[in-house]
Amino acid sequence: MTTRGEQVKVAGDTQVDTRSSSGRTGSWTIESANANVDNSNTNGTQRGLTIDGANSNVAHADAALDAATLSRALGTTNVALTNTSGDLTVNGAVNWASDHTLALTSQKGDVALKQAVAASGAKASVKADAAGQIRIDDKLALTGDQAHLELNAKKGHRFTQDNASVTLSGRNASFSSNGEGYQVIHDVAGLRNVDRDLKGRYVLGNAIDGKGAAFRSIGARRAFEGVFDGLGNTIGDLSISNPGSNAVGLFEANGGRIANLGLDRISTRAVVPYGRTPASVGTLAGYNFGTISDVKATNVAVSSEGMAIVGGLVGSNYGGSIERASVLGFVNGGNDALHVGGLAGENISFVSPGADDALIRDSRADVQVVSASNGSAGGLVGDNHGVVDRSTATGIVNARGSGARVGGLVGVNNGGVINASTAAGDVRGARNTSVGGLVGHNAGRVDASTFKGIVAATDGARVGGLVGENRGVVHASTAVGRAMGGASNVGGLVGANFASVSDSMASVNVDAGMAGVAGGLVGHNAGRIDASSTDSYVTAAASGIAGGLVGRNAATGEVLASSAAGDVIAGDFATAGGLAGVNDGAIHGSSSKGAVMAGMMAQAGGLVGVNAGTVQASASTGSVVSDFESVVGGLVASNSGVIDGSSASGDVRVGFGSIAGGLVGRNTGTVRDAGAKGTVAVTGTGKAGGLVGFNAGRVSSSSASGDVLAGRGSSVGGLIGENAIGASVEHSNATGSAAGGHDSYVGGLVGFNSGMVASSSAAGTVSGGYYARLGGLAGANFGTFDNATTATRVALTPGYRQQAGAFAALNFGLFKGSSATGAAAGMPLANLNYGQIRD
């Protein structure tokens, strides 16, 4: 009987019986654009689009019939539903006890079994045909003897929910797909029999409980080359080994296709005698050359003794593909493991590094990974030469061997590609390791990937929130959490960078121990950092180096268009910078705005602690604070390189015996086209300048507008605290006030000058304590002023026995072509003049 039409609606009380007296049964065929099965009493939809019903079930108000009507009909007839327009959806539970067949066909779309389908009768069958894919969202159970299931789809079949599975538990049950017949396995003995035909096609008819039995790997030193479809069923409670073989797993090696399989409570172990070829061990397969998809392993334990490659699911993925796989459990590589991974020990391309013939996609590992060797360990993959795409690892990765390479996702990415992947958890390494939240050692490409958690190692390590050591490309990636190391290179994103980091970000608490190097984004940079940022909180202990973005930027290092916003704290004898602790390379178009704080005898700069390279078109806005006998600058603490077109606006404060400048503390290099606006203060004796505290280099076309203050016996200048012999200042100016304590040298432009000052001006106010020497241009001049001007107000305090002059209190050098105007015009040019003053 055929019911055909554009829209068909079968009444709920319809009864169809095609049984004959001869024992044969006919079929009821429904062909329509709305040939779907609905749950009873659900509401609305339009054709081809499912909408949530009142009971949160997807429903078709225009469905041809409901599940109860279909179930009743299957008791008295075979039923064939054909959707002529779109997807055919079974949205209500269907069950029957007869030997009849349910046939479901979608001529133009998918067949979706969203609710349970169950038949208990002998010879009952279900046949599904789809132009697209068959999706099974619930249980499909055919439990009678000689039951048959047939699934035919251009795009195959998938089990889309965790509880979805097929049961074919009766005697002589059968299965076929796309014209191919499969053997149905019901027990451990059936698994063992796969050895007889390694090119065969198999399905699991039900879950298999091994009850703790020992099980030798399928294969007998040969690869499986057939099809093994678990149909959503689980194999559980086995103890797998493979004595005498280099590959250990449920399958020794897979060169075929394994899909839709669960593995639970399985322990797998490889023991490799000394001197033997390393073994590959994984719960599912030692080697994979084929295709693995939709495999879920839970509560598994994988371990090795001797040289081995160890993975939670696969030991070695050699040019194979693993998609939509997951592992939950424990992986232990022992003392001699080469590579250890939560999902795969290694992922190796046979074509070329980074080729997708070795592919892990949409997969996940939640595994505790432990290794005591100096090899590689990763939460997902130990060693990757292929592609890891849209995959995730969570849990703990702990490598205790010196020199190991450890990553939350991948231990070593050697020419491989990691894309849109994540790791979260706790990643730890020992001495001299490369440890990264995502990748331990990267010599490939990391794109659009993230880590969230804790990364830690001891001394001599390279520790990064995302990558421990980078010799490849890191792009558009992020790290959040904490990165810790002893006397190590520690970075919020990368511990040590020798290649490229771009468009990336870190928000990490970064902590390096004594003599360690810490950077908010990168610990040690000898490569290129471009368009990246961090708001990491960075700390380094005594004698360490700390930078808001980079700890140390080496001579080959470049920092371009990048920024740091977090605070930087360093201990005694340390070097700290808001952007870079030490710069021997190039910084261009970059900025920092966090506070910088350091202990005694330290060097602290708002942007860079110590600069021997180039700082260009960059700025800092954060405050800088350090303890006694330190060198501090609003932009750079100590400069022997070049500062060009850069500025600082944060306040600078430091203890006694220190050198402080609004831009640079100590300059032996070149400063040009630069400016400083912040207040500079030295508590006690020191050298303090609105721009430079102590200058033994060259300053040109620069300015300072902040106030400057220092204590007793100091050299204080609106622009330069002390300008040394051989130093020069040109085309520069100061407009802030300068104040010194007792016995200080205070100048509107320079506190104490032994060098050359040309074409420069001052226009602030100078003042001091008892016996202070105050000058509109310099407190004391032993060098040369050429074409300098001052409008400085010299504020004398009655009774303080101060010395003052419009140019200088003391002149033992030369003033040439200089002038005093405004508040300075009515004063003697010098209080004591033992040099020359001429037009």
Predicted feature descriptions by range:
Residues K9, S32-N34:
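Alpha-helical scaffold domains
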Residues M1-G26, L140-L142, Q146:
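Repeat-solenoid scaffold signature
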Residues A35-D839:
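Surface-exposed repetitive/solenoidal architectures
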